[in-house]
Amino acid sequence: METFLFTSESVNEGHPDKLCDQISDAVLDACLAQDPDSKVACETCTKTNMVMVFGEITTKADVDYEKIVRDTCRSIGFVSDDVGLDADKCKVLVNIEQQSPDIAQGVHGHFTKRPEEIGAGDQGHMFGYATDETPEFMPLSHVLATKLGARLTEVRKNGTCPWLRPDGKTQVTVEYYNENGARVPVRVHTVLISTQHDETVTNDEIAADLKEHVIKPVIPEKYLDEKTIFHLNPSGRFVIGGPHGDAGLTGRKIIIDTYGGWGAHGGGAFSGKDPTKVDRSGAYIVRQAAKSIVANGLARRCIVQVSYAIGVPEPLSVYVDTYGTGKIPDKEILKIVKENFDFRPGMITINLDLKRGGNSRFLKTAAYGHFGRDDPDFTWEVVKPSSGRSLNLKVLVVIIPACFIELIIGCLMLMLNSPYSIEVSYMMI
């Protein structure tokens, strides 16, 4: 059996880039909670003892930007200079302007357009991906790297590993084989964890704790063997971290946010953007489409692309590729996708309820991935169900003599109470 290796990485919530993503999305949450029609394009950057929030925001909400910054930093664990940033003492700079009137008139007509008329906030192309290799319909390499990062944070905050500090990175290499276009995991080849720590712990203690409290609870035993390689804090020292160790900026972890290098990426970041920004809403709807295709058994693996022009509601293109794993031709799957998913930005917003802020809804997306999460706030993860009735009908027609076909079809029409249901393969409701 010929196999290949594929690697995905992740970073946890204390990484400076992820800190910025979380602040940007915390601002978005605050705006949408008070004013669902807020137009938000919020960026954040950070370096030693400083956080800056900047961008374009048009909202009726009364937002205390400095408080959001400090609360977000504190909740992550940046509570002293020793760990890389002190939430209560750092400088907070704010430079927010209104959305450009040129953009406003073209996209939403200064709030006068109906939802179906709202145009895309910018040009661009977005990708959604799904695979049947995990229950989350996500790539295993990405799932494991992401869960390791989340587990690092969990054992830091619950005191299991008190020597841990907020910053950290993970990486997992999985050995796969190709099963007629589908990807089947065989084993975990390599696990890499680099985590910030205090001065009190030895490298041997770090390695032992990471294996026992982080790796073992996350990676299923069936994927680990005597050949699995572990690189645990291979640099030998990681005391200086967070914004003290590296500058951070919103939107620099877009592969970690999505599929860990699988599928494709259009280049647009998500955090700090309201749903008129198709970088975010477009990526969410094509994830739902791709996941629905795989979850309904139409394919084992699928990528969906959508593209937009600024100010134009209808997408310029929609594309589907099942990598040869489709149960029916890709052109038929594309037809089903177009019939069941509305790719206009205003309608995506309604169908996925993307104007709803609060409850840290978008803040939750800003660490540990936007996809594959079991959370009711992640509405784009809801699979549109399939009936599959016409596929069964096709099988009956093949095996039953022609003289009975009209009778069978008539009976089925009465049972289904709709001739249309018989015509459409795998119709998603």
From Swiss-Prot:
Provide the family line.
Answer: Belongs to the AdoMet synthase family.
Coiled-coil regions listed: none
What keywords is this UniProt entry annotated with?
ATP-binding, Cobalt, Cytoplasm, Magnesium, Metal-binding, Nucleotide-binding, One-carbon metabolism, Potassium, Transferase
Which residues does Mg(2+) bind?
Answer: E9
Question: Mind telling me which Pfam families this protein's record contains?
Answer: S-AdoMet_synt_C, S-AdoMet_synt_M, S-AdoMet_synt_N
Q: Which organism is it from?
A: Carica papaya (Papaya)
How would you summarize the oligomeric state and partners of this protein?
Homotetramer.
Q: In which pathway does it act?
A: Amino-acid biosynthesis; S-adenosyl-L-methionine biosynthesis; S-adenosyl-L-methionine from L-methionine: step 1/1
Reaction catalysed by this enzyme:
L-methionine + ATP + H2O = S-adenosyl-L-methionine + phosphate + diphosphate
Q: Which residues bind K(+)?
A: E43
Q: Which InterPro entries does the entry mention?
A: ADOMET_SYNTHASE_CS, S-AdoMet_synt_C, S-AdoMet_synt_central, S-AdoMet_synt_N, S-AdoMet_synthetase, S-AdoMet_synthetase_sfam
What does the record give as cofactor? Mn(2+); Mg(2+); Co(2+); K(+)
Where is ATP annotated to bind?
H15, D167, G168, K169, S235, G236, R237, F238, D246, R252, K253, A269, K273, K277
**Name of the protein in question:** S-adenosylmethionine synthase
Q: Which domain of life is it from?
A: Eukaryota
Which coarse location class describes where this protein primarily resides? Answer: cytoplasm
